[in-house]
Protein backbone atom coordinates (compact mmCIF):
# COMPACT_ATOMS: atom_id res chain seq x y z
CA UNK A 1 0.00 0.00 0.00
CA UNK A 2 2.88 2.39 0.67
CA UNK A 3 4.72 1.51 -2.54
CA UNK A 4 4.01 5.00 -3.89
CA UNK A 5 5.81 6.66 -1.00
CA UNK A 6 8.20 4.08 0.44
CA UNK A 7 11.10 2.82 -1.68
CA UNK A 8 11.50 -0.19 0.63
CA UNK A 9 7.89 -1.25 0.01
CA UNK A 10 8.47 -0.93 -3.73
CA UNK A 11 11.62 -3.08 -3.41
CA UNK A 12 9.66 -5.73 -1.51
CA UNK A 13 6.95 -5.69 -4.18
CA UNK A 14 9.56 -6.02 -6.93
CA UNK A 15 11.09 -8.97 -5.07
CA UNK A 16 7.73 -10.71 -4.63
CA UNK A 17 6.94 -10.25 -8.33
CA UNK A 18 10.38 -11.63 -9.19
CA UNK A 19 9.74 -14.69 -7.02
CA UNK A 20 6.33 -15.28 -8.58
CA UNK A 21 7.94 -15.13 -12.01
CA UNK A 22 10.73 -17.51 -10.97
CA UNK A 23 8.12 -20.05 -9.85
CA UNK A 24 5.98 -19.43 -12.94
CA UNK A 25 3.08 -18.06 -10.91
CA UNK A 26 1.01 -14.93 -11.31
CA UNK A 27 0.89 -12.58 -8.35
CA UNK A 28 -2.34 -10.88 -7.35
CA UNK A 29 -1.75 -7.45 -5.83
CA UNK A 30 -3.84 -6.74 -2.77
CA UNK A 31 -4.67 -3.21 -1.68
CA UNK A 32 -4.95 -1.49 -5.07
CA UNK A 33 -6.50 1.64 -3.57
CA UNK A 34 -5.76 4.30 -6.21
CA UNK A 35 -5.30 4.59 -9.96
CA UNK A 36 -1.62 5.33 -9.32
CA UNK A 37 -1.25 2.00 -7.50
CA UNK A 38 -2.67 0.25 -10.55
CA UNK A 39 -0.41 2.12 -12.97
CA UNK A 40 2.74 1.25 -11.03
CA UNK A 41 1.70 -2.39 -10.68
CA UNK A 42 1.10 -2.62 -14.42
CA UNK A 43 4.50 -1.03 -15.08
CA UNK A 44 6.01 -3.74 -12.85
CA UNK A 45 4.22 -6.42 -14.87
CA UNK A 46 1.52 -7.27 -12.31
CA UNK A 47 -1.77 -7.53 -14.21
CA UNK A 48 -3.96 -8.94 -11.44
CA UNK A 49 -5.12 -6.97 -8.44
CA UNK A 50 -7.86 -6.32 -5.96
CA UNK A 51 -8.71 -3.26 -3.96
CA UNK A 52 -11.14 -0.39 -3.54
CA UNK A 53 -10.22 1.31 -6.82
CA UNK A 54 -11.28 -1.87 -8.63
CA UNK A 55 -14.31 -2.79 -6.53
CA UNK A 56 -15.68 -2.34 -3.03
CA UNK A 57 -16.59 -5.47 -1.08
CA UNK A 58 -19.85 -6.91 -2.41
CA UNK A 59 -22.10 -9.89 -1.88
CA UNK A 60 -21.39 -12.87 -4.15
CA UNK A 61 -24.72 -12.37 -5.92
CA UNK A 62 -23.58 -8.90 -7.10
CA UNK A 63 -20.41 -10.15 -8.81
CA UNK A 64 -21.98 -11.08 -12.20
CA UNK A 65 -23.49 -7.59 -12.63
CA UNK A 66 -20.22 -5.98 -11.56
CA UNK A 67 -18.25 -8.13 -14.04
CA UNK A 68 -20.59 -7.13 -16.86
CA UNK A 69 -20.29 -3.41 -16.10
CA UNK A 70 -16.67 -2.98 -14.95
CA UNK A 71 -14.17 -1.35 -17.27
CA UNK A 72 -10.55 -0.58 -16.42
CA UNK A 73 -9.60 3.05 -16.07
CA UNK A 74 -8.29 4.52 -19.35
CA UNK A 75 -4.94 5.24 -17.66
CA UNK A 76 -4.48 1.49 -17.22
CA UNK A 77 -5.07 0.64 -20.86
CA UNK A 78 -2.03 0.02 -23.04
CA UNK A 79 0.31 0.01 -20.04
CA UNK A 80 3.29 -2.18 -20.74
CA UNK A 81 5.77 -3.51 -18.20
CA UNK A 82 8.98 -1.53 -17.99
CA UNK A 83 12.35 -3.13 -18.63
CA UNK A 84 14.66 -4.02 -15.75
CA UNK A 85 16.94 -1.24 -17.01
CA UNK A 86 14.17 1.29 -16.28
CA UNK A 87 13.52 0.15 -12.70
CA UNK A 88 15.91 2.77 -11.26
CA UNK A 89 13.67 5.48 -12.75
CA UNK A 90 10.63 4.02 -10.99
CA UNK A 91 12.53 3.76 -7.71
CA UNK A 92 13.75 7.34 -8.15
CA UNK A 93 10.14 8.44 -8.73
CA UNK A 94 9.06 6.81 -5.44
CA UNK A 95 12.08 8.11 -3.54
CA UNK A 96 11.42 11.69 -4.65
CA UNK A 97 7.75 11.42 -3.63
CA UNK A 98 8.90 10.12 -0.24
CA UNK A 99 11.42 12.96 0.17
CA UNK A 100 8.81 15.63 -0.58
CA UNK A 101 6.40 13.91 1.83
CA UNK A 102 9.07 14.19 4.55
CA UNK A 103 9.50 17.91 3.83
CA UNK A 104 5.73 18.41 4.01
CA UNK A 105 5.54 16.32 7.19
CA UNK A 106 8.17 18.51 8.85
CA UNK A 107 6.48 21.75 7.77
CA UNK A 108 3.12 20.48 9.04
CA UNK A 109 4.63 19.44 12.38
CA UNK A 110 4.19 15.69 11.80
CA UNK A 111 7.96 15.02 11.78
CA UNK A 112 10.58 16.24 14.23
CA UNK A 113 13.43 16.48 11.74
CA UNK A 114 13.57 17.52 8.10
CA UNK A 115 15.09 15.28 5.46
CA UNK A 116 18.57 16.07 4.09
CA UNK A 117 18.34 19.17 1.89
CA UNK A 118 21.44 19.04 -0.33
CA UNK A 119 20.20 18.34 -3.85
CA UNK A 120 23.31 16.34 -4.76
CA UNK A 121 22.96 14.03 -1.75
CA UNK A 122 19.35 12.86 -2.00
CA UNK A 123 18.68 9.60 -3.83
CA UNK A 124 17.24 11.48 -6.79
CA UNK A 125 20.30 13.74 -6.97
CA UNK A 126 22.62 10.74 -6.84
CA UNK A 127 20.68 9.03 -9.65
CA UNK A 128 20.66 12.24 -11.68
CA UNK A 129 24.41 12.67 -11.21
CA UNK A 130 25.33 9.13 -12.24
CA UNK A 131 22.82 6.60 -13.61
CA UNK A 132 20.77 9.17 -15.50
CA UNK A 133 23.90 10.24 -17.40
CA UNK A 134 24.11 6.76 -18.92
CA UNK A 135 20.70 7.16 -20.58
CA UNK A 136 21.63 8.70 -23.92
CA UNK A 137 18.10 8.44 -25.36
CA UNK A 138 16.63 10.61 -22.57
CA UNK A 139 19.21 13.41 -22.74
CA UNK A 140 16.72 16.29 -23.15
CA UNK A 141 14.42 15.08 -20.38
CA UNK A 142 17.36 14.66 -18.02
CA UNK A 143 18.59 18.18 -18.83
CA UNK A 144 15.11 19.49 -17.91
CA UNK A 145 15.15 17.56 -14.62
CA UNK A 146 18.31 19.18 -13.24
CA UNK A 147 17.09 22.78 -12.79
CA UNK A 148 13.68 21.58 -11.62
CA UNK A 149 15.29 19.35 -9.00
CA UNK A 150 17.46 22.23 -7.76
CA UNK A 151 14.39 24.51 -7.61
CA UNK A 152 12.49 21.95 -5.53
CA UNK A 153 15.37 21.67 -3.06
CA UNK A 154 15.71 25.46 -2.84
CA UNK A 155 12.00 25.83 -2.07
CA UNK A 156 12.13 22.98 0.46
CA UNK A 157 15.09 24.67 2.19
CA UNK A 158 13.13 27.93 2.31
CA UNK A 159 10.05 26.21 3.77
CA UNK A 160 12.10 24.46 6.42
CA UNK A 161 13.88 27.71 7.33
CA UNK A 162 10.49 29.41 7.71
CA UNK A 163 9.24 26.59 9.94
CA UNK A 164 12.38 26.72 12.09
CA UNK A 165 11.98 30.51 12.40
CA UNK A 166 8.48 30.01 13.81
CA UNK A 167 6.74 31.11 10.60
CA UNK A 168 4.80 27.91 9.97
CA UNK A 169 1.90 29.71 8.28
CA UNK A 170 4.22 31.24 5.68
CA UNK A 171 5.78 27.82 5.05
CA UNK A 172 2.37 26.11 4.80
CA UNK A 173 1.22 28.71 2.29
CA UNK A 174 3.93 27.58 -0.14
CA UNK A 175 3.23 23.83 0.03
CA UNK A 176 1.01 24.05 -3.05
CA UNK A 177 3.98 25.33 -5.05
CA UNK A 178 6.16 22.53 -3.71
CA UNK A 179 3.54 19.99 -4.82
CA UNK A 180 3.27 21.64 -8.25
CA UNK A 181 7.04 21.40 -8.76
CA UNK A 182 7.08 17.82 -7.48
CA UNK A 183 4.28 16.82 -9.85
CA UNK A 184 6.11 18.39 -12.78
CA UNK A 185 9.31 16.51 -11.98
CA UNK A 186 7.45 13.22 -11.45
CA UNK A 187 5.61 13.60 -14.77
CA UNK A 188 8.94 14.09 -16.56
CA UNK A 189 10.31 10.96 -14.91
CA UNK A 190 7.26 8.92 -15.88
CA UNK A 191 7.58 10.15 -19.46
CA UNK A 192 10.92 8.33 -19.55
CA UNK A 193 9.05 5.07 -18.88
CA UNK A 194 6.63 5.40 -21.82
Predicted regions and their residues:
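Bacterial c-di-GMP phosphodiesterase catalytic domain signature
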Residues: 1-24, 36-40
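Conserved acidic
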Residues: 8, 12, 28, 33, ...
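Residues within well-formed alpha-helices
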Residues: 15, 19, 26-28, 50, ...
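Short alpha-helical scaffold segments that flank and stabilize functional sites
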Residues: 19, 23, 30, 52-54, ...
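Cyclic nucleotide signaling catalytic output domains
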Residues: 26-69
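Non-catalytic regulatory/interaction regions at protein termini and inter-domain linkers
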Residues: 39, 43, 65-194
Amino acid sequence: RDMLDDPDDLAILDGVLGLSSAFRREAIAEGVETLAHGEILLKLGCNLGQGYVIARPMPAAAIPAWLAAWRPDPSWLDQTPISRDDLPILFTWVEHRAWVAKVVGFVQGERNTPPPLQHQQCRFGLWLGHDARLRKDDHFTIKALEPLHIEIHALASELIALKLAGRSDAAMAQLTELHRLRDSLLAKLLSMLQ
